[in-house]
A protein has these predicted regions:
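Membrane-proximal interfacial segments on either side of biological membranes
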Residues: 1-217, 222, 229-317
Length: 317
């Protein structure tokens, strides 16, 4: 059943029923019928598969040594220890031990969906992931805590060992984000910091555009906008070694005044009098993941890039 690379190979039928290292039950049957394979079962833990997908690691797609179409119908798919999908179905086309095409869909509760597509043309692989329930994806980023609600769109184009990706998250709330809390505190925006540590700060949209090559992630732009604050930043991350980010944070009241609107949160954020409080702040975050250093400086004007991105989002909404 297994070849020298420990891949499942040359089989007509195999039954799998075991507890994995996460203590999740996996119960599957892989069966060949004519030139097609069928993967059915009651449960499967896809935690590692999701991790590989987000990091653009192909190792998870090379478990089965077949060149065929694979039809999937699994009752329950575990995304982690808390979240799971039901009625997970779809088709995967495999060639040279790599996924060439995939179209998969599953359901959360309350009619929420997860949809995954993969299309490989020549040497370019396009991956899209849409999730009505963003939390099981976002919680994988350990520095974000207290994330709630929201839907997520993920797009990635990979050629050779380089990938260009985009993540968008809509209508979500953050309750804990240590780095952001520190920036707000250093910037004397205690009103917003208190909201963040209490009921949480709501964002209408988050967009991150980035590239991956080896252990280096280059963040071309992160932009987030919400009723309380807007943030624009860029930088890079060396996996398990170094994080380097710089950006601008501006209270919503500043943006509203700039475009001639009434302040949304009023004096709690920037004070009672005109000119009181901070117009905005620039910040830098740098260091090893467990020892990040943060610096903050006030800014008197907004960059054209920040203004353009903000107006784009306001017009869109």
């Amino acid at each position: 059943v297994f070849n020298e690379k420990l891949q499942i190979s040359g089989l007509d039928e195999v039954d799998l029923d075991y507890l994995d290292q996460d203590r999740q039950k996996n119960s599957l049957t892989l069966k060949k019928s004519k030139k097609k394979y069928f993967l059915t079962g009651s449960s499967f833990n896809a935690d590692n598969f999701i991790e590989d997908l987000l990091s653009n690691d192909d190792k998870g797609s090379k478990i089965i040594d077949i060149n065929s179409n694979l039809e999937i119908d699994i009752e329950k798919i575990f995304l982690d220890s808390e979240y799971y999908l039901t009625d997970f179905k779809g088709d995967i086309s495999i060639k040279n031990n790599e996924i060439q095409k995939a179209n998969l869909i599953g359901s959360f509760s309350k009619n929420k969906k997860l949809k995954l597509t993969i299309n490989k043309d020549n040497n370019n692989k396009i991956t899209t992931l849409y999730v009505d329930e963003a939390k099981p994806i976002v919680k994988r980023y350990k520095f974000i805590k207290g994330f709630d609600e929201g839907s997520l769109d993920f797009y990635s184009s990979k050629k050779s060992k380089k990938s260009v990706s985009q993540i968008k998250i809509y209508d979500f709330k953050l309750k804990e984000l240590p780095i952001l809390t520190k920036i707000l505190t250093l910037a004397s925006l205690q009103g917003i910091a208190d909201i963040l540590s209490g009921e949480g700060i709501r964002f209408t949209e988050f967009e991150m555009n980035f590239k991956n090559e080896g252990d280096l992630m280059t963040i071309e732009e992160i932009y987030a906008i919400g009723p309380a604050i807007s943030i624009l930043m860029e930088g890079y991350v060396e996996k398990n070694k170094l994080i380097s980010l710089k950006g601008t944070l501006v209270p919503a009241t500043t943006i509203n005044n700039f475009i001639g609107s009434l302040p949304m949160l009023g004096e709690i954020l920037v004070g009672k009098k005109t000119g009181e409080g901070v117009f905005g702040v620039s910040f830098k975050i740098k260091g090893p993941p467990k020892n990040l250093k943060t610096s903050v400086n006030p800014v008197k004007t907004l960059t054209p890039r920040f203004i353009t991105r903000t107006l784009e989002k306001i017009k869109k909404n």
